[in-house]
Amino acid sequence: MVRAAVLPAVGAPLEITEIDLPDPGPGQVRVRLAAAGVCHSDLSLSNGTMRVPVPAVLGHEGSGTVLAVGEGVAHLAPGDDVVLNWAPSCGSCHACSLGEVWLCVDALSGSADVYARTAAGVDLHPGLNVAAFAEETVVAASCVLPLPDGVPLADAALLGCAVLTGYGAVHHSARVRAGETVAVFGAGGVGLATLQAARIAGASTVVAVDVSPEKEDLARAAGATDFVVASADTAREIRALTGKQGVDVAVECVGRASTIRAAWDSTRRGGRTTVVGIGGKDQQVTFNALEIFHWGRTLSGCVYGNSDPARDLPVLAEHVRAGRLDLGALVTERIALEGIPAAFANMLAGKGGRALVTF
């Protein structure tokens, strides 16, 4: 039996309880978690903005050590340090055939499986495939990537979602070039990773935007050259910082209609806006036909940073080893499983960066 944070039903409080994990079957791996990041996607799953079968063990941003492998698993062995890959690609759908593995239609199919049971015998599903809010997990081997050398094991959890997403938004989706100007809306875990990625890309001006003035120090440490407290005048303030032109690129990491609109308005004519934040269906963004034509701007969605974890993890590890990417700087609190509800509340209040559950 291992301890886990169980979501019994959508909208219900998490329950910290013991669960019964089976031994890994063919093609499966058992992992002892070192850490798991608390992501806004976990909050979205708990409140029903996103849907997975319940009851479920949430948590998708994790790192740990292999305890056992099932039959047929050849690329991993007990004792290996690993990062969990919550969105493994199938390799055969249309998106995968185009090389767009981040859009794989079957990536989350494992979330419907029963992977464990409560002490009372209730079936449990692995939220977003990997069920990282637990001391241990059993996952498909495709959900496990070897951790490159030189990356701290606990902090490596952030590579599984926040960093892949933020780095990919800058380098794969928006394709920021050296010397360009960038605005990042939202300075939570993904936003802070995006700021670091913009700095790595060589952006000349990096503006962080957040509702919380107390995040300025965090944002500047991550690479922001300027900080703007979000308001109705945000776009005007950003244009003032960029010679009245607006930024080349805006990355929205919040998922609200108002911030998507502000991000669009903050870009120059011909600028690019990338939306990373997950918003609800009730968040309606309005544009008129003339402005779409006249401004010549581009608006694009960005799923998981348009990243291929197997391809990008070694690149990110090299940035960590070279000191260009500081994983620890993204973490504003290290908590136990019992601290997850408070971490969710802090997200809703716009407080802090990434909370990291450590085991």
Regions found by a protein language model. Give the residues of each.
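Mid-domain Rossmann-like dinucleotide-binding core that forms the NAD(H)/NADP(H) cofactor-binding site
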Residues: 81-82, 135, 142-144, 148-232, ...
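Local beta-strand N-terminus motif with an aromatic residue
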Residues: 79, 179, 224, 246-247, ...
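Short Gly/Pro-enriched turn/cap motifs at secondary-structure boundaries
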Residues: 20-21, 54-59, 124-129, 135-136, ...
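Glycine-rich cofactor phosphate-binding loops and adjacent beta1-alpha1 units
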Residues: 174-177, 213, 217-298
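Glycine-rich beta-strand-centered segment in the early N-terminal region that forms part
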Residues: 22-36, 49-97, 102, 143, ...
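Residues located in well-ordered beta-strands
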Residues: 3, 15, 20, 32, ...
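C-terminal hydrophobic helical "lid"/dimerization subdomain
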Residues: 2, 261-265, 306, 310-359
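Cysteine-cluster motifs in flexible loop/terminal segments that predominantly coordinate metals
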Residues: 86-142
